[in-house]
Structures are given as structure tokens and as C-alpha cells.
Amino acid sequence: MPNMEPTTKEIKEQKIYQEMGLTDSEYELVCSILGREPNYTETGLFSVMWSEHCSYKNSKPVLRKFPTEGKQVLQGPGEGAGIVDIGDGLGVAFKVESHNHPSYVEPYQGAATGVGGIIRDVFSMGARPIAMLNSLRFGELDTPHAKYLVSEVVAGIAGYGNSIGIPTVGGEIQFDPCYTKNPLVNAMCVGLIEAKDIQKGQAKGIGNPVMYVGAKTGRDGIHGATFASVEFSEEGEQQRSAVQVGDPFMEKLLLEACLDVIRDHSDILVGIQDMGAAGLVSSSSEMASKAGAGLELIMDDVPQRELNMTPYEMLLSESQERMLLCVKKGHVEEIQALFERYGLEAVVIGQVTDDKMYKIIHHGEVVANVPVDALAEDAPVYHKPSKEPARYQAFQEEKAFVPAMDDVVGVWKELLAQPTIASKRHIYEQYDYQVRTDTAVVPGSDAAIVRVRGTEKAIAMTTDCNSRYLYLDPEVGGAIAVAEAARNIVCSGGKPLAITDGLNFGNPEKPEIFWEIEKAADGISAACLELDTPVISGNVSLYNETDGTGIYPTPVIGMVGLVEDLAHITTQDFKNSGDVIFLIGETKAEYSGSELQKLQQGKISGRAPELDLATEKKYQQLLLTAIQEGLVASSHDLAEGGFGVALAEATFKAGLGADVEVPFALNQLFSESQSRFLVSVKPENEAAFAQLMELEKVYRLGVVTEDDTIRVKHKEDQVTAKTTELRSIWEGAIPCLLK
């Protein structure tokens, strides 16, 4: 028999609503909206829909700062994913989503279902997913638990992505102590769509049926959205019931069936949405609210895989591989027949109404009846207090860190062995990045590139964020995250189009944390405006704290760019001996927040590196022009580890060397100054490249050599290192640490 649910009186007097995630004032607001005390099911509906994860009640004032419009934008924020125009009637849909809390509790399933959820967001728009990326954060690889988390998260991503047949083509991983108990797992999906096929998540047309398709509903993931909206604790590790279990083979069937409906039955499909966070209640109430309609759902008709499920459990379950469709009256059988061909259930569970109410019926009784807008649109919005942390001013005034560089080659080797810098081949080789056979640039270069079939175009894509810079200065660091993403796209031959942002922060109820969120948004907005990359989708993950210890501010930037001609595709590795090496951009003694500072001081402090957005834009445009004119053989942005690491990485693939003279002192070899690019050009293109770059801070450094030796000179100083030795250290670091 099902458990007896608390009465309205018990909910109020025992403050059961607090356990469900509502504050006292929010509970009172619900009572005011309803004109009565909510029952248990209704309290559950409000608790999940008013969670930060679903309502963005703490972050909405900040999100409004983002530029979201541009001539390239076909769909901005507010739907399952954003979409940009790439010409020829085609669009690219993409979005990033976090699955942080679940991935700490149950790393394999947490990561796997994060992948599944973001794939559904993209195909719910009518787009065929063509690529996956991820952005991961872990603690140092010096404990068995850290190694376990990395191995299981990567296995979960691989297990789901490989099984469903979507290539995982790129991403980034950073290791820092602040992520030890707060790992971040952000998954990004990119899809291709014909502009005419764009769908909306809406339920309109009075009397139109609402259909449930896909897997049956179980008790997994109940209150998952609430779980993701509170600070974590050691006890929270026991909350495995809030973590869903995924089935990629079911998802593959669901994907193909939904795309068939969109392609062949668009005239009878009114709307479609994934059942993601907060499950059925979220998808159904949002679809009705967006259309200005109401909804009546019959819980008895919801496919269930467990006995005696209550309406509360069915509405809040986050069981995976489920979609909600609204179709025109009289066409249910057509839709059911299509889904049956894929072996999937498609069941009518309700209909659109005209009263703007959200009515739930079970065993012939009304068990919930609330205004639909109150759930989906009218959550309270909080303008949290904001306060500059004491550390910020201290960092501004701190004496600049000066690295110990007595043994330059020794430092070089140490840096290449740091897991944040070291080769991630051991990780990405677990992913099938060639499935679908359209991957033009595989993991390991600045950006991944996937061809657009039937055209000469390709899509460049990347995820980026150096959270250490944001810890020092969230505004500058936020701008750098966008700039670096754009750099990676440009270095690969693409024109940056737009971003999706995964905003991972600590507890917003702490004024110092909310200050970080505000400032990071300011930096991201400024860079997006300057570089013409509007924010078209995203995700907010707050409360990434465990027992009071939080993460660095980590707004992950997922960016997509257009490679207009396959001939423009460029990679970071040197191609031929004799090619001429150039450095674009100025190198300064900037080590704060750098991999070198972390290595030598064991901590991060000081002023973040400077970023001039006008200079950044100018250099990116010049480099992209040079690439499009066929003048560039290789191109690599300078990021973690600065020039020294970028130069070494450029030699590794072909086993070449380099003989260069740099315009800065050798103790600045690992400075992380911004807006810099390492470029090689064929000798016959040198004059044209130099002319294009005339009057800019562009330096001819030397040439690519046939031997496996890197020689770096500045005036009388010189260092020499063997490519093979550096590569061995770089490639072996992570496999060694994960043993």
C-alpha cells in the first residue's frame, strides 16, 4: 500500500515544506496564490518548480545582463536549446547543461544521464545531434576517491555517448583542490537543423491531447531539481535516490522517433519538450504556460514501472528517456503508430484547457489544481545582497609573483606533467569521436570540427573556462573565458557565432558568492558584445559547496563557430620543417592565476592577467582573414602554460622541432598574457602574412625544424629541449596519475 501523505495541517505545522525546499515566505506566498493551504502534491509541485534549478530565482537578475540577440540568432534563450543560422537554410542548435551534484553521489550514472538530458534538449528543437563536448572539474589526482570520480565520470560519458552513436569530439578538464568534493560535469550537445523544422516547447489549442512517449516512470530522481539547488553535505552522498539511471539504447529509439515525427508529421505536432529537471511537472506546466493555456493531466494513464506510485511521485520523478508531445486532435493514432514502429509507448495523459489552471486527476479525484503560471513563470525572484570579498582588494595590492626560473627546462617539464596541461588522450580515447564519420578535427586541437554533410562547410566547437582567473577577478576572468573560446574557434578556421553558458558557482546566499556571479556576468556580457557572440542558451548550477567549502567561479563557455570552407580548417600542430613561426600578441610578466604559480606557490593569488577586448577582436579578425586567404599552416592559442607549452604542443604531433628567438625574457616563457597566437606559415606565404599583420604586435620568431629539438633564444640566453622527451612527459602524466 502507498504511504499516507501528510495532511495540509501537518505540512504547515511541522514545516514539511522546508524539507521539500520551500522557505517560510515561499510557503506563505503559495498559500496566498491558492487562497488556501496546499496539499502534499501541490507543495511538491511548487517546491521543485520554484527551486533555483528550475526557476533561476536567484540568478534571473544576473541573466538579464546577457546580450541574446544578433542577426545570426534563430532561437535565443527560453527553449530547449539555442539556434544560430549558418546559411543554406540550416541552423546549429546547441546548449550546455550541468549534472554536478548527481556526479559526485553516483559518478557513472550522474555523468551518463547528464549526457542523455542535453541530447534530448537538442533533438526536442528538431535538430539531429551531431556532436558532444564536455567540461569537467575535479580535485587533485592524489587520492583514490579523486581517481575513482574521474574514471567513473569519463566512463559514464563514454558509455552513454558511444552507445547512442553521437561522437564526443572535444572538451576540457581542470584539476584544483576546490573541486575535490564539488566536481563539475558540464555536457554540451550540438545539433544540425533545417530552419523550417524548428520546434517549440508549447501546449496550445483547447482540447488538443498531450502525449507521453518513451520510458516508463519510476521513482528515480524524485526531487533531483531540489537536490541540485541546495548546498551539499557529507550526508548528501547518501542521496542516491535523487540520481537517475539512463538507458542510451532507449534514448536512441526516442531520438529517431521524435525526429521522424518532426520531419513527417510537423503539420499535426503542436509542441515537444524533454522531461528533464523536475520531470513531468516541469515539462507540462512550462509547455502550457508558454502558450497561455491550461492543462489537465490524468495520472492513472501515466506509464509506470513501479507499483502504487502516487501523483506526487509521478509528477516529480526524473526517470530518463521521456518526452512530452502536444498534438492536434484526431491524430493520436498516427503518432502512436509511428512510435510503435520503434517499440515505444505513446500514451495520451491529458489535454490542453482554456482556464490557465494546472489540474491533476488521480482515481477520478482532483489531487492538485493550481494556476499554471504560478508554477512556471511566477516564482519569486530574489535580488541577493552582493559584497566584494576581502581577498579581491588584497589581490589587487599584492606584490606580483615572480617565478623561480633557474632551470627553465626543468620547469617546462614540470608544467607539461601537470594534469590540467598534460595530454588528455587517455581520457578522450575512451570516447568514440569518429562515429558518424563527419569529425574533421578530433580531440586534442584548439577546437573540434564536424563537417556539415552536403556542403563545403563545417562547425567548429569548444568549451572553455579558466576558473583560476575568475577567482582572482571574476569580471576579467569571465571576459577571458569568452575570449579564449573565440580564440580556439578562430585558430581552427571558424568565425565565432554564439555561446551557451554553464554558470557553476557556490552558494548565492553568501554575498561574496553573489558578487562573483554578478561580476562574472558583467565580464561575459562585455566580451560577448565586443566579439558578437550572443548568449543563446545555458544553464545555472549554484550551491556547488560541500560543508561550507565552495568552488572557484566556473562559468563554462560553450562556443560554436562556422568554418565557411573545408579548406579553411586549421590545426595547432606544425606541418613542415622550414615553415616560418610567428607570435601574435604581447607577452608580459603575468603569472597570477597561472599554472606556474600554482605549481611553485601551491596557491592562486594576485591580479588576473589583463585583457583588452578591442585588441582581442582585432587580432582574431586578422588571424581569421589570414586563414581564409590560405596563408596559415598552423595556429594555436596561448593558454595555460603560455608560450612554452603552446610551442611544445605544436611540435608533438609530427615530431618536429623549432628554432626561435623570442621578444621577451626567457623567464616569461610561461607567462599567461592574453590575446596571443602561435602561427606557422609556409615560406612562400611569409611576405603576404607579414603584410596583412603590418603595424600590429606580430613577431617573426624563427622556423620549424626537422630534428626533434626545440631551441628558444632571447638575446644571449638560450634553452634547448628534446621534443620526444617533452612529449613523453606530457603524454604519460595522466595515465601515471590515474594508476
Swiss-Prot record:
Keyword Cytoplasm: yes
Catalytic activity: N(2)-formyl-N(1)-(5-phospho-beta-D-ribosyl)glycinamide + L-glutamine + ATP + H2O = 2-formamido-N(1)-(5-O-phospho-beta-D-ribosyl)acetamidine + L-glutamate + ADP + phosphate + H(+)
UniProt pathway: Purine metabolism; IMP biosynthesis via de novo pathway; 5-amino-1-(5-phospho-D-ribosyl)imidazole from N(2)-formyl-N(1)-(5-phospho-D-ribosyl)glycinamide: step 1/2
Catalytic site: H53, H99 (proton acceptor)
Binding, substrate: S98, H99, N100, H101, R120, Q244, E318, S319, Q320, S541
EC number(s) on file: 6.3.5.3
CC terms in the record's Gene Ontology section: cytoplasm
List of residues binding ATP: Y56, K95, D501, G538
Cell compartments where the protein resides: Cytoplasm
InterPro entries: PRibForGlyAmidine_synth_PurL, PurL_linker, PurM-like_C_dom, PurM-like_C_sf, PurM-like_N, PurM-like_N_sf
Ligand binding (Mg(2+) 1): E97, N539
Residues that hold Mg(2+) 2 according to the record: D121, D274
Assembly description: Monomer. Part of the FGAM synthase complex composed of 1 PurL, 1 PurQ and 2 PurS subunits.
Protein family per UniProt: Belongs to the FGAMS family.
NCBIfam families (UniProt xref): FGAM_synth_II, PRK01213.1
Function noted in UniProt: Part of the phosphoribosylformylglycinamidine synthase complex involved in the purines biosynthetic pathway. Catalyzes the ATP-dependent conversion of formylglycinamide ribonucleotide (FGAR) and glutamine to yield formylglycinamidine ribonucleotide (FGAM) and glutamate. The FGAM synthase complex is composed of three subunits. PurQ produces an ammonia molecule by converting glutamine to glutamate. PurL transfers the ammonia molecule to FGAR to form FGAM in an ATP-dependent manner.
UniProt protein name: Phosphoribosylformylglycinamidine synthase subunit PurL
Species whose genome carries this gene: Listeria monocytogenes serotype 4a (strain HCC23)
Gene: purL
